[in-house]
């Protein structure tokens, strides 16, 4: 029984000044023909009709807060500070910087790696005594034997 009854929903309504009929707020016009003007349009029309003074015009135009700009004082102290800041930034540019994004070609990187290998291929065991070489070889053999004897489950 309660399902057949229609629920009364209270809507936001406004009354038409000409016919005093209640109309939903979302409607822009009344069935009698009266057209409701929104506040935005009303304010826009008022501003077109009466141009505001120069002070009010500037305030009306400026809606967002603007960034506060500091005035630079022309002095030798400020110039010295700027020069110091610039000299620091130049010293950082001397270091090799990696480019951002995908590299264009890997050939340059390969050349660098080859140069590094050639420089690093100096035999560090050339000056090693025979006794030390024997100790190292025994240690390596022991490590290899332990690795081979392990049962690895793959």
Swiss-Prot record:
Keyword Protease (UniProt): no
Span of the signal peptide: none
Designated name of the protein: UPF0547 protein C16orf87 homolog
Biased composition (Basic and acidic residues): 68-84, 109-119
Native organism: Mus musculus
Record keywords: Coiled coil, Phosphoprotein
Keyword Nucleotide-binding tagged: no
Family membership: Belongs to the UPF0547 family.
A Pfam family it matches: UPF0547
Annotated spans, Disordered: 43-119
Chain segments annotated as coiled-coil in the UniProt record: 104-132
Top-rank taxon, per record: Eukaryota
Residues recorded with modification Phosphoserine: 91
């Amino acid at each position: 029984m309660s399902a057949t009854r229609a629920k009364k929903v209270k809507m936001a309504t406004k009354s038409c000044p000409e016919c005093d009929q209640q109309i939903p707020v979302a409607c822009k016009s009344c069935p009698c023909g009266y057209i409701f003007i929104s506040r935005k349009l009303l304010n826009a029309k008022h501003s077109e009709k009466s141009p505001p003074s120069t002070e009010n015009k500037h305030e009306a135009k400026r809606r967002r807060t603007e960034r506060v700009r500091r005035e630079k004082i022309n002095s030798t102290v400020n110039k010295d500070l700027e020069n110091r800041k610039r000299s620091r930034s130049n010293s950082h540019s001397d270091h090799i910087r990696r480019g951002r994004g995908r590299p264009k070609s890997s050939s340059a990187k390969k050349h660098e790696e080859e140069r590094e290998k050639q420089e690093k291929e100096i035999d560090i065991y050339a000056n090693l005594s025979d006794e030390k070489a024997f100790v190292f070889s025994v240690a390596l053999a022991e490590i290899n034997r332990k690795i081979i004897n392990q049962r690895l489950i793959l």
